[in-house]
Amino acid sequence: MPLESFETSPTPFPIGDRPMLEYGPRGGGDAAEQCLRIRARRVFPASRKELFAAWTTRPACESWLGFRAHSRAVVKPYAGGAFRLELAEGPIIHVITGSTVEVRIGEFVSFTWIHHDRDDYGSIVDVTFGQRGDQSELCLVHHAIASRREAAWLMRLWAAALDRLEHYLVPRTTRRVASAVAARRTSSAA
């Protein structure tokens, strides 16, 4: 997957299927201090409440965030709560830990991210949840990434994870719609 780089951050970034890599000034704007950041924006066929729950409950995270069946997650969705991901990728187990920085139920979650044995420098993930009619919108910004190598791995991770999140949410939505249609049929037949 090609990485798209930008000198500065576009204020409204487009909705698309792929995360974008940005390389821009860190905090104070000193050109010598640069930081890598990944932005992703996606619309899902689910409510904002369902999307938020997919990010903040252990069974949901294990279902969509892991690379395969041996991946595990521990999620404590409150400020100061810890999280741990063990993502199995072939023979490699990626261990990611962090803590929840801020949570606004149904709207926003921010957490630190440390990818052990790869780069022990912590980065930050901010996820905003919005409603667009009967769908929900997710805006993810993973910033303060220490290296291009880590950014490349994270680009692949977030692209695959957001695809899996969509597959995780679609069957739930499909079942909800199917049961609503069945209920209408039953009530109209009576």
PLM feature segments, named:
Residues 2-71, 190:
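Hydrophobic ligand-binding cavity/cleft-lining segments
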Residues 39-40, 59-95, 177-186:
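Short beta-edge strand/loop motif at the mouth of beta-sheet-based domains
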Residues 51-52, 61, 83, 100, ...:
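Hydrophobic pocket/interface hotspot
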